[in-house]
Design a protein with these regions (language model features):
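Acidic, low-complexity/disordered tracts enriched in E/D and polar residues
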Residues: 1-35
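Short acidic, hydrophobic short linear motifs in intrinsically disordered regions
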Residues: 38-54
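Conserved alpha-helical substructure of the radical SAM core
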Residues: 56-203, 207-208
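Local cysteine-cluster metal-coordination motifs and their immediate loop/turn environment
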Residues: 108-118, 366-369, 403-420, 474-481
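Radical SAM/AdoMet-radical enzyme domain recognition
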Residues: 135, 139-155, 164-288
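Short Fe-S-cluster ligation motifs
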Residues: 139-157, 394-396, 432-476
């Protein structure tokens, strides 16, 4: 399968299954578009009719171009066969290990964000803080079910996890002890709204957390529209100085500013640029997912605006990078020379199988958006996964699980998409959240274009970097989890 698009002056041709990316002139671009369904003579005639007045386009040149396209097809770099579907079929029968937990240490929050999917941290239930005993058992569950996998991921989540900070500190200390006993390596992430950040939190996170996610929606008026405290006051003025101090002391350790855009700020690039101008360089901005009747919900009329915004963002990132003031955007981080192996590209995030959410009471769910939905209760941290039917349903979530995705050029980049978004949009975890698909495909086009621009700049300096994904890193070819 081949996908062609034009963006920022580049004519880009992507071969889906090989991952090869080709940057061509407009003549070759049109030749490739005609190649599958036309003879060489038909292509030459059409191209001469369109470009025949140009001195640099001759019949001989066109036939050479057609031969080059044929060579690329023969070498598997255009219209490469899809040989991966059988791998996806095997996933449902494989034994999986648990490699990551989203630990809900607080089902309560000190903000009252009106768009919160988690009902201000309560997840449609009671307010609660996780006890140390439950947290410790959750870590034991992770160790016991991780098999030979050494690196284990734990995300301290909520609600607002810093409302249970003392327990978090005790739990991390416990995990550091268990690492030595079981030959494991825990990597922690903290997701916080920032209200409770102080020097103690900063020092702890910089010592213990592999990554930190800091919630900021961008411009003050945008952020404060939704992210208010219970007295109705916006939180921007409180958290921005805290975040700036946090990031200043963070050094080269990982962090992300994570925002949400809605119908009210479809010009969300201005929020990203605002965060960059505040000095933050690791940025992410997510589209709101909510009931279509919600006034903040994104609409069909918003879609072309959002796609244009992603293009504006990509072009500005290239510009700022050249000026020495670049920043990273999470959804544009794509590795076209290595990247994840084909097993990962097919199977996605592993929710419900390799990754689970744990409530303050020790219940297990496939991931945090499913928490509180009795249909998706997997079990608990004492008895393990007892609802094996739901787990097996999640095993089937992959790039080949949906008929609608079979002819989609982006399927090996989205890995089938987010199961939670699909469920909330369609009622099925293997449904298709079409709005999200459209945004994802535009993000991928922009991400690839940025890589093309970077490669062309390197090529101008005499540095050649081929853009082509390998099919597998072989790390998990035998069914073992990637490290």
């Amino acid at each position: 399968m081949v996908h062609q698009y034009q963006l920022n002056g580049y004519n880009i041709v992507l071969d889906t299954c090989s991952g090869s990316v080709h940057v061509v002139d407009e003549v070759a671009y049109d030749v490739i578009a005609m190649y599958p369904d036309h003879t060489a003579d038909e292509i030459v005639a059409a191209m001469m009719a369109k470009y025949g007045d140009r001195e640099d386009v001759t019949e001989a040149d066109l036939r050479q171009c057609i031969d080059d396209v044929a060579s690329l097809k023969e070498s598997g770099k255009l219209w490469s066969p899809d040989t991966y579907e059988n791998l996806a079929f095997d996933f449902k029968n494989r034994n999986t290990v648990v490699k990551a937990l989203c630990l809900h240490v607080a089902h309560t929050c000190n903000l009252n964000c009106s768009y919160c999917f988690a009902s201000q941290g309560r997840y449609q239930g009671e307010r609660a803080l996780m006890s140390f005993e439950v947290g410790k058992r959750a870590m034991d569950f992770l160790i016991e079910n991780s098999g030979s996998r050494r690196n284990l991921e734990v995300d301290f989540f909520g609600g607002e996890p810093l409302m249970n900070f003392d327990m978090v500190k005790k739990l991390v200390a416990y995990c550091r002890e268990q690492e030595k006993i079981h030959n494991k390596n825990f990597r922690f992430t903290m997701t916080t709204n920032g209200m409770l950040i102080d020097d103690d939190v900063i020092d702890f996170c910089n010592k213990e957390c592999h990554n930190v996610v800091l919630s900021l929606d961008g411009r003050k008026e945008v952020h404060d529209r939704f992210r208010k405290d219970y007295a109705g006051h916006g939180s921007y003025d409180t958290i921005v100085p805290k975040f700036q101090e946090f990031v200043k002391k963070r050094g080269d350790k990982g962090y992300y500013m994570r925002g949400t855009f809605t119908h009210y700020n479809t010009d969300f690039t201005n929020d990203i640029f605002h965060m960059a101008d505040l000095g933050f360089t690791e940025l992410s901005m997510e589209p709101v997912v909510c009931d279509p009747s919600d006034p903040s919900a994104l609409t069909e009329a918003d879609l072309p605006i959002l796609k244009e915004q992603y293009e504006i963002l990509a072009k500005e990132m290239i510009k700022r990078n050249r000026e020495g003031r670049g920043f990273t955007f999470y959804h544009y981080m794509i590795d076209l020379t290595g990247g994840p192996c084909i097993y990962k590209r097919i199977s996605g995030c592993g929710s419900g199988t390799e990754y689970m959410a744990v409530t303050p009471w020790g219940d297990l769910y496939p991931c945090h958006p499913f928490v509180g939905d009795p249909k998706y209760l997997l079990g608990d941290i004492w008895k393990g996964v007892t609802n094996t039917a739901v787990r097996d349903e999640f095993k089937h979530c992959n790039a080949y699980a949906r008929k609608e995705c079979q002819d989609c050029w982006a399927k090996l980049y989205c890995s089938g998409g987010c199961a939670a978004n699909s469920y909330h949009a369609t009622g099925s975890i293997t449904g298709v959240y079409e709005y999200g698909c459209e945004l994802f495909k535009k993000r991928m086009e922009c991400a690839i274009m940025i890589k093309v621009a970077e490669n062309q700049e390197l090529a101008a300096k005499g540095i050649e970097v081929p853009i082509e994904l390998g099919s597998t890193c072989n790390a998990c070819a035998d069914g073992e989890a990637c490290e």
